[in-house]
């Protein structure tokens, strides 16, 4: 049934009904009170199109920073300004979801220089630190938490080397970076870093502890 819907979807988009729907959404963005609802609805609809099953129930037993070494291990991933400016958000999220990792937290914000400095505090002695903070706080960043078995290590493999020119073909940085100094994405490099970064960017009530009805890692 889903495949039939997927084939029909382009026709639906081309129809007058879809145009009226998108026009309504466009008007709604003019109303500040509608923005949060529309952003949430867009994320929900995108996930529904991308998967054949959805949320079953809430799993309240997982702490904010996850459980390293288990199926509920968590990693912090940030899509940087250079990616949001190039409209690569969906492409990057898809890489993690196709690998079977579960998105449990997401927000879009422009970090303050203070927040950016705290995020990169382990690099504060480096000569490039001030430039890094300035760039990271210069525009919209998509902050995310992904959950799954070995997500920290595997996430780093998906991302590629810090220097995009040294990244392997097929990694996010090799495929999508166009400038070495702007490597488009950040990912936790250890369970300790993940715990620190998740707590820095997210509160308990901003994480959705949901359980998939078609689990990949839930029972492993």
From Swiss-Prot:
It is found in: Mitochondrion intermembrane space. GO terms for molecular function: ATP binding; metal ion binding; nucleoside diphosphate kinase activity. Residues 1-57 form a transit peptide. It comes from Dictyostelium discoideum. It is an enzyme of class 2 (transferase). Keywords: ATP-binding, Kinase, Magnesium, Metal-binding, Mitochondrion, Nucleotide metabolism, Nucleotide-binding, Phosphoprotein, Transferase, Transit peptide. Major role in the synthesis of nucleoside triphosphates other than ATP. The ATP gamma phosphate is transferred to the NDP beta phosphate via a ping-pong mechanism, using a phosphorylated active-site intermediate. Its main location: mitochondrion. Its cofactor is Mg(2+). Belongs to the NDK family. One of its GO terms (cellular component) is phagocytic vesicle. ATP binds at residues 80, 128, 156, 162, 173, 183. The active site is at 186 (pros-phosphohistidine intermediate). Pfam families: NDK. InterPro entries: NDK-like_dom, NDK-like_dom_sf, Nucleoside_diP_kinase, Nucleoside_diP_kinase_AS. This is Nucleoside diphosphate kinase, mitochondrial. Coiled coil: none annotated. Its EC number is 2.7.4.6.
